[in-house]
Amino acid sequence: MAPPAKRARRGLVPPGYKYLGPGNSLDQGEPTNPSDAAAKEHDEAYAAYLRSGKNPYLYFSPADQRFIDQTKDAKDWGGKIGHYFFRAKKAIAPVLTDTPDHPSTSRPTKPTKRSKPPPHIFINLAKKKKAGAGQVKRDNLAPMSDGAVQPDGGQPAVRNERATGSGNGSGGGGGGGSGGVGISTGTFNNQTEFKFLENGWVEITANSSRLVHLNMPESENYRRVVVNNMDKTAVNGNMALDDIHAQIVTPWSLVDANAWGVWFNPGDWQLIVNTMSELHLVSFEQEIFNVVLKTVSESATQPPTKVYNNDLTASLMVALDSNNTMPFTPAAMRSETLGFYPWKPTIPTPWRYYFQWDRTLIPSHTGTSGTPTNIYHGTDPDDVQFYTIENSVPVHLLRTGDEFATGTFFFDCKPCRLTHTWQTNRALGLPPFLNSLPQSEGATNFGDIGVQQDKRRGVTQMGNTNYITEATIMRPAEVGYSAPYYSFEASTQGPFKTPIAAGRGGAQTYENQAADGDPRYAFGRQHGQKTTTTGETPERFTYIAHQDTGRYPEGDWIQNINFNLPVTNDNVLLPTDPIGGKTGINYTNIFNTYGPLTALNNVPPVYPNGQIWDKEFDTDLKPRLHVNAPFVCQNNCPGQLFVKVAPNLTNEYDPDASANMSRIVTYSDFWWKGKLVFKAKLRASHTWNPIQQMSINVDNQFNYVPSNIGGMKIVYEKSQLAPRKLY
């Protein structure tokens, strides 16, 4: 007889939990709630400390702080008790030092040695005080701030000894930061790690690194700029060319990594969409390191030559808007995120935001004289909102060798499906019983219900007939909805195209035609266009959503008749029929059946150019989804990261002389690194038949490898090829 299976140690765990309490083992299965999940992560971190020779029970550790942060909004009693227990421990226990900021839950974290510094560094280090020298040694041995938890106050971490006021900055003429000139302060990592967990879950850690080039701003001033292109829109029929708006142009730049192509290469994405059924967005962190600042001067010779010098006293200004004070400006909508190629330097986009500007546009038509009427109302004083980073967000000053880390942001988003649905209203529920089945193969041999339509049993909402058919049977809800198709609406700031949920809407499949609100992307060489392309014309593609919205815009129609009477022309409205005698305006332009019975899928992730997450609207009635990103952050989203080369003035600067400062031409190169963590569910096969998966043909294969002069491109990939039932 086999010995009984050894049971996992339960420890002192209260009822309803598996990990919240001391003495339990780490193999109790899936946590029961978010507090229990935080306790499991806390236990795994403690195990990592113990393996590295540290005793976390006697000290307050970063793992304790992380548990406090994760349970600060806990609704369950166990999470609340654990939260206040570790807050009490924080108040009385000494801090655990010389440990990783965030021990890995998958393997022990070991300090990593940096490259040996040049000899002159030791001369500078020898002059330091004993305490300062010890701190430098710890900084040189400590790993990067991967996994550092962003504190409640949202303050990032800056590794810069000058900020301590101890006079322990590294040598090098007043610059050099904590690492010093010649000492690397970080690692370059673009690997995607897949960690397979219990019950079909996978933890996906996407690492991304880029060399970022930043020039000093054209001006140090904020500017309010109005764009007026009435020369384009003054002609009848050119309303779609309207660009009139107002914006604030700032001296800052935005480091935006909110696009799928920043994080995953084409091979990674193929693996994800072929094997996973859904994605959960977990956490995000980023940092700046190995900052380099240089000045540019020109010689007086003819022709002049440029001279580049390291400036160890110049500064890079960095600001993290962790509280989302600034206007939210995702750069993916303009294809201005960080580049998609890890080996190619990239640039941050100049940061700007919209400013209130009212106007009225009355379009003209052939029956009127003159041009379209534009009435400018300007800015309403009641609506003025002018934001500046300098007095709204803490600004950190980095010099050569310094580094900056944001800490970890944890998302609160609904999951994103990697499967599509095909069922429309006609495929919901129990099909009719067939009295007659085909007796031979062939497409012309059909089944037959065999019962007269008015003799069948079932439920309809047709009050004037007893017919029960596939057209009249009552379904539980409405799959999809008819939406305004290619429609423009008016707002107080000008016309806009009505956003609609994308989905497979009919027979149109050409990439230059959006079948039913399918997004069309235009992008340049940093974001997928062939890298050896010449000229300014961007490359484009239309993402044809694979899922079915339940609607057929090209063949749609509306019928409103007495059901038991013959159909007349006046009782049916076709897509080509005009409304109110207006030629070309029909019900598909204005008809909307969205309502409380509507069932709708989320938008698909669009690789590589699509946006990943979006900010929730600050309105009382929230939209159920956003058409530009599958993940909508509840309450808050990751803070935007702004950078700017600080003014490097000359002795000729006179604040009263002109609007432009007398500045030394200065630019910065720095390394950016981020980590984006997902949890994914492995897709289980429940059908007998195999399914289509993301693949490429022989011709497309060579898009992903360079040519003899380095030319290559990224082709968009489908993300929801596997079908699923919705009912």
Curated annotation (Swiss-Prot):
Residue ranges, annotated region (Phospholipase A2-like): 19-64
Alphabetical list of Pfam families matching this protein: Parvo_coat, Phospholip_A2_4
Protein's UniProt name: Capsid protein VP1
Domain notes: The N-terminus of VP1 is sequestered within the mature capsid. It contains a phospholipase A2-like region and nuclear localization signals that might be exposed by capsid modifications during virus entry.
Keywords from the UniProt entry: Capsid protein, Clathrin-mediated endocytosis of virus by host, Cytoplasmic inwards viral transport, Disulfide bond, Host nucleus, Host-virus interaction, Magnesium, Metal-binding, Microtubular inwards viral transport, T=1 icosahedral capsid protein, Viral attachment to host adhesion receptor, Viral attachment to host cell, Viral attachment to host entry receptor, Viral penetration into host cytoplasm, Viral penetration into host nucleus, Viral penetration via permeabilization of host membrane, Virion, Virus endocytosis by host, Virus entry into host cell
Assembly description: Interacts with host TFRC.
Residue span of region Disordered: 1-39, 95-120, 141-184
Composition bias type Gly residues, residue spans: 166-183
Cystines in this chain: 633-637
Stretches with biased composition (Basic residues): 1-10
Binding site for Mg(2+): 323
Function: Capsid protein self-assembles to form an icosahedral capsid with a T=1 symmetry, about 22 nm in diameter, and consisting of 60 copies of two size variants of the capsid proteins, VP1 and VP2, which differ by the presence of an N-terminal extension in the minor protein VP1. The capsid encapsulates the genomic ssDNA. Capsid proteins are responsible for the attachment to host cell receptor TFRC. This attachment induces virion internalization predominantly through clathrin-endocytosis.
Motif Nuclear localization signal: chain residues: 4-13
Family: Belongs to the parvoviridae capsid protein family.
InterPro entries for this protein: Capsid/spike_ssDNA_virus, Parvovirus_coat, Phospholipase_A2-like, VP1/VP2
Miscellaneous field: The capsids of autonomous parvoviruses expose a proportion of VP2 N-terminus and part of that sequence can be cleaved of to form VP3.
Cellular compartment(s): Virion; Host nucleus
Chief place where the protein resides: virion
Compositionally biased intervals (Polar residues): 25-35
Cellular component annotations (GO), alphabetically ordered: host cell; host cell nucleus; T=1 icosahedral viral capsid
GO biological process: adhesion receptor-mediated virion attachment to host cell; clathrin-dependent endocytosis of virus by host cell; entry receptor-mediated virion attachment to host cell; microtubule-dependent intracellular transport of viral material towards nucleus; symbiont entry into host cell via permeabilization of host membrane; viral penetration into host nucleus
Signal peptide: none
